[in-house]
Amino acid sequence: MKKLITLVASLLAVALLTVPVFAAENQSLAVDITKISISNEANNDLLNAATESSPVNGTRITTWDNTGHATQRRDYSESVPGKPQHYWLKNSANRSYAVTCYGTDGQQVTLQSFTRNMTTQPVKFINEGGSSFNIYGLANTTYILALTTTGSYNGAPVLWKGSNNQNNQLWVLGAWG
């Protein structure tokens, strides 16, 4: 009987290990890190808080070459309760501010005071697969809009836009540090 239990436990462990990491929509991110860099699939530029110091309310989000500054890091360690795959994207240079969407197509992405606002602050990470499991679409599901870069130059605005099936809406998550 002891051998049978051991065999069943072993088979169950093997079966669980063979399930793909992203098999279920409700799983959390594959990599459990608290600080990430987010670069655009189209041009490798990083999400960037457009400031030379610490972000404040209303700081615009742009894309920029890697400068190594904390304004290009995001903290996503806090998942949104009851909303699988949703995270608050706080800026590492000042964690009092989070990425916010106000719901209009073409709205400039900004940082606003982090309030745990369930409508305008959660960002959903949608695995897009591709050649890497770290490629995601970032969406505000309340308004069905995707995080979109508008160009491949330093300071290119990042907007919330409807899905366009282009790689300017795909983002690569990387460990920072």
For each predicted feature, which ranges?
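Sec-dependent N-terminal signal peptides of Gram-positive bacterial secreted proteins and lipoproteins
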Residues: 2-22
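Lectin-like carbohydrate-binding module/patch detector with strong preference for beta-trefoil
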Residues: 24-177
